[in-house]
Amino acid sequence: MNGMSGSSPAAPAPSPSSFFQHRHRHGGMMHMTFFWGKTTEVLFDGWPGTSLKMYWVCLAVIFVISAFSECLSRCGFMKSGPASLGGGLLQTAVYTVRAALSYLVMLAVMSFNGGVFVAAMAGFGLGFMIFGSRAFRATSSNSHTEVQSHC
């Protein structure tokens, strides 16, 4: 049926091995296990590149994103109060931003770079310590503060 009314045969899908060969020919390497090194790609094609300075910038960005995500998760920007559409929209917007940031961190960790993983966990840990733990929370002596959960 080739050649009938402008139809063309379907092109075969590229094999997984051809994808990895393409990445290798163009200088990129897709890791499937954790590795340590400054030459990696995180979130965007070619970022942070091969520069040690840009790698440290990348780690700092991942650290800040994960800490800020924890801040949004733990700070309780919307205290309990009367039901309102405006309050619900604001709460939904904050939740959506927090979810997006968390997914960005997850995708960054999927680069399998050990430094990115450590930066993400350190950011989440520091974010929890500042915004979720008892370390920086002012409480009265007769009240007990429970750690808020994500749910």
Swiss-Prot record:
The chain crosses the membrane at residues 52-72, 103-123. It is a multi-pass membrane protein. Pfam families: Ctr. Coiled coil: none annotated. The keyword Cell inner membrane does not apply. GO terms for molecular function: copper ion transmembrane transporter activity. It comes from the Eukaryota. The keyword Transmembrane applies. Induction: No change in expression levels after treatment with high concentrations of copper. Keywords: Copper, Copper transport, Ion transport, Membrane, Transmembrane, Transmembrane helix, Transport. It is found in: Membrane. One of its GO terms (cellular component) is membrane. Its main location: membrane. Highly expressed in stems and at lower levels in leaves and flowers. Belongs to the copper transporter (Ctr) (TC 1.A.56) family. SLC31A subfamily. Involved in the transport of copper. This is Copper transporter 3. It comes from Arabidopsis thaliana (Mouse-ear cress).
